Amino acid sequence: MLTQLKKNGTEVSRATALFSSFVEKNKVKCPGNVKKFVFLCGANKNNGEPSARRLELINFSERYLNNCHFFLAELVFKELSTDEESLSDNLLDIEADLSKLADHIIIVLESYSSFTELGAFAYSKQLRKKLIIVNNTKFINEKSFINMGPIKAITQQSQQSGHFLHYKMTEGIESIERSDGIGEIFDPLYDILSKNDRAISRTLKKEELDPSSNFNKDSVRFIHDVIFVCGPLQLNELIEIITKIFGTESHYKKNLLKHLGILIAIRIISCTNGIYYSLYKEYYFKYDFDIDNISSMFKVFFLKNKPERMRVYENI
């Protein structure tokens, strides 16, 4: 399809130009009830999978927090590792970008790395109010560096900064591998996360959606919608569509991989044999034009020329 996208007058080229013209005219709106992003930090098991506690939190969110997307940094790193250029980025900067994108940051204090993450995030006054700290009840009143340093910094900023959830945590290496009583914090966690922070829709300008200059919730949601409208897509096809919408001045590959990484991490898109496609199967944004007509132009092209491309949806 890449050739057809680059060639003027083709069906998909006309569809892309039409899409671009409406984005240019600020015809994209973010609804007030859009899902929140929750960055979940903590330990990993010996096999590299998330700790049992983090898996319990993800399962809880999928069952009861339909207004939230939980995501892990590891899956974003994995997507970026497929590109040699992106490998030059240090993980601290990437994690900092992810924390800025998130509405909330949950840190389960269960490993040395999670204590390090707490210190890094608590250092930023902008991030302190996003933090939800899960800690062992036995450490509530302990005069430790954690309590007297990062946690005190969070609470001193304001009464609204951060949330602290405690329960009797199992200790030792087995606590990473096996579930404990983390369910004790589910009710207060639900109370924190189930609230919608925004009630009204927003009109989005073109420059706010450009993935070369933004890595935020709006640009991530827009990339999903592009894939849903125009896809399933290969990476080079996505780059060509984004270039036609936002212009040729920027190099999009590395920035798009970061966006794709977060979308894969929250299981909103998937990638099979180099083909990216939506698992969400609905638009994040509202469009003040016939977005389904543009989508049908792409789908008709695939059915005529690449019917095998549409088979990725068969197993969803």
Curated annotation (Swiss-Prot):
The name this protein goes by in its record: Retron Ec73 putative ribosyltransferase/DNA-binding protein
UniProt keyword terms in alphabetical order: Antiviral defense
More details: Part of pro-retronphage phiR73, which is homologous to bacteriophage P4. With the help of P2 bacteriophage, is excised and packaged into an infectious virion. Retronphage phiR73 can lysogenize a new host strain, reintegrating its genome into the selC gene of the host chromosome and enabling the newly formed lysogens to produce msDNA-Ec73.
Main function: Possible ribosyltransferase/DNA-binding component of antiviral defense system retron Ec73, composed of a non-coding RNA (ncRNA) followed by this protein then a reverse transcriptase (RT). Expression of this retron confers protection against bacteriophages SECphi4, SECphi6, SECphi27 and P1. At multiplicity of infection (MOI) of 0.02 cultures grow normally when infected with SECphi4 without collapsing, at MOI 2 cultures enter growth stasis.
Disruption phenotype: Not required for msDNA production.
Biological process terms in GO annotation: defense response to virus
